[in-house]
Amino acid sequence: MSKQNNFRRYNPLIDEWVIVAVNRINRPWQGAKTEKSTTISTSSNTEQSILNPLAPGGTRSSGIANENYVSTYVFDNDFPSFTEFEECAGKDENDDLFKQHEVKGVCKVICYHPNSQLTLATMDVKEVRVVIDIWNQQYLELGPKYEWVQIFENRGAVVGCSNMHPHGQLWASNYLPTLPMKKHESQKKHFEKHGKVMLMDYLEQETLKKERIIMRNEHWTWLVPYWAFWPYETMLLPNRHVERFTDLGEVEKQSLSEILRSLLIKYDNVFECSFPYMMGWSGAPTGSFLTENCSFWQLHLSFFPPLLRSATVPKFLAGYEVFAEKQRDLSPEIAAKTLSEIDEEHYSKKLQ
Amino acid sequence: MSKQNNFRRYNPLIDEWVIVAVNRINRPWQGAKTEKSTTISTSSNTEQSILNPLAPGGTRSSGIANENYVSTYVFDNDFPSFTEFEECAGKDENDDLFKQHEVKGVCKVICYHPNSQLTLATMDVKEVRVVIDIWNQQYLELGPKYEWVQIFENRGAVVGCSNMHPHGQLWASNYLPTLPMKKHESQKKHFEKHGKVMLMDYLEQETLKKERIIMRNEHWTWLVPYWAFWPYETMLLPNRHVERFTDLGEVEKQSLSEILRSLLIKYDNVFECSFPYMMGWSGAPTGSFLTENCSFWQLHLSFFPPLLRSATVPKFLAGYEVFAEKQRDLSPEIAAKTLSEIDEEHYSKKLQ
Ligand SMILES: [Zn+2]
Ligand SMILES: [Zn+2]
């Protein structure tokens, strides 16, 4: 890997940026044809550490060995898109048609648990809570330094992650990326126009309409957004106004661990498989935004699962959707109804 | 299938619409795990017509049989996202947070050739020219009636099309979809600011820079956009200002058939496979836009191939990309260099 930072370029036709991570081209590729998500068959911890580069003591493709961790474990991504080197692999350009800027930051992997056979859905509430605390700690540590800290998880080969060890990622950057920038602007505009926080306003109306709400507890509501794109796309919202993850109280975090585990069990039960998904947190930006007014932001957790009809048939983002407009077949209301009615006990327990 | 039109909904967080095609949920699913693209092994025309629902005389999943066509063949999609029924499956809503509109239109399939074993890359120039004339005829026929006529092709199981019979699609709608709308606005803005057509201005600068131009003839230039996202994303541009496909002259269409075939051969040669791609035309909108000034538009043909390292390893759009910002690993300049240097003779001819 070259010792230079990557850069991003601007697409003036559709007003989006794209990161050009020339650093990463030589990284080993572990993925993944589209295949049924499976958990690794029962094996001892010793076998695991040989087989799985994310397990305690496991050796990663970079040759670095993991600590013998017993709870969560955070390490720097061996092939990061964001780095903090002195130089950049590309020069800044500022023309309207040729716009390119250096990107800096850090990319980490967050292992949720030492046991490769567990998932957030099959870990117990106490273990999920530990993951939530790790997320909080990362936001506290990286927020002051970076404009945007993206915590996310790709689960399953069908979304490009073939290692089923329970883990997510964190990418923190010295700039506000395309999508959070859009969310920043739209929430700001909504507040200026209506004097209300967009997603609070939205949650209030959904609470009355009822038809897209799947599950709620005292502090959180899980729903299918009216505008959902992915077949079983959902959003988890705090019931009160919360700008950032780090604004959550202890009780809210405890409550989050409960509803997060419950909703992931429901997901697994849809097709009786370890449901593949992309999951990501969004809240008010950090870094220089910490001293700005971001009160129009509402924290939310998005789930984008690609499966539509079975454990092996993913939704393709193709053709008309990449040239003109996205499309979904299943209505958001039917998706909400399916998820509402599905069992709250994990299917694997019933098979025993 | 219900006899009701579909609708689209607005996502106020990221300013995008999504089509909710509740009509389509019951369509038969022919796709596709990620697999190496293959052509059907040699078989007689009779066998083909039994095996392949897109071949002459073939029976489609709807039970409808194709004509015994000998050149190109256009038919209405049996499970269309756009229809022209009397009623809509959803009521119009116009709230800022709950915005939903009926969509109307037509979806067609365009078979390029009766022979299931050919592709645009392996057809001869005369046969490619016939496809171009069919595209032109469709634009002429549907343009006056619809605001946007999207001609596109998904090629290969990896982009969701498992039927290798040479074919593309056309979706025409009574509204301007999300991405063409963005292109409309950005090109307009560029013209207002610079007094130049954005993509003409861009082509002029790329012609001087040279490093992303792959191939050109008298009327067309094939290049990797500075802001390309897909690993081998490219764009084909007319050398002069052309607003719409139907503005192309006879000589330009002849020239297009030549360069289109040549560039697709290069694509196939990258990994010595029938290269999967999404291909789509964009030009000034039609319908009510035909009487408006759209002179800031430049016609272009985009190619979004998902392969990165081999015939079986696709790029995933996942994780960070769906929550924050798109990323590519290969630089646009290296992609351009690879495509420039690759052979112009189809690999299948060399294997013989
Ligand atoms: Zn992973
Ligand atoms: Zn197809």
UniProtKB/Swiss-Prot annotation, chains A, B:
Active-site residues from the entry: 167 (tele-ump-histidine intermediate)
InterPro entries: GalP_UDPtransf1, GalP_UDPtransf1_His-AS, GalP_Utransf_C, GalP_Utransf_N, HIT-like_sf
Pfam families (UniProt xref): GalP_UDP_tr_C, GalP_UDP_transf
Region (Disordered): 33-57
Pathway assigned to this chain's UniProt record: Carbohydrate metabolism; galactose metabolism
Binding sites annotated in the UniProt record for UDP-alpha-D-glucose: 77-78, 154, 169, 315-318, 320-321
Class in the EC hierarchy, top level: transferase
Keyword Nucleotidyltransferase: yes
Obligatory cofactor(s): Zn(2+)
Catalysed transformations (reactions): alpha-D-galactose 1-phosphate + UDP-alpha-D-glucose = alpha-D-glucose 1-phosphate + UDP-alpha-D-galactose
A single cellular component GO annotation: cytoplasm
Cofactor binding note: Binds 1 zinc ion per subunit.
PROSITE patterns referenced in this protein's UniProt entry, alphabetically: GAL_P_UDP_TRANSF_I
Compositional bias ranges of the Low complexity kind: 37-50
An example Gene Ontology biological process: galactose catabolic process via UDP-galactose, Leloir pathway
Complex and partners: Homodimer.
Family per similarity comment: Belongs to the galactose-1-phosphate uridylyltransferase type 1 family.
Cross-referenced NCBIfam families: galT_1
Protein name: Probable galactose-1-phosphate uridylyltransferase
Organism per entry: Caenorhabditis elegans
The organism's taxonomic lineage, starting at the top: Eukaryota, Metazoa, Ecdysozoa, Nematoda, Chromadorea
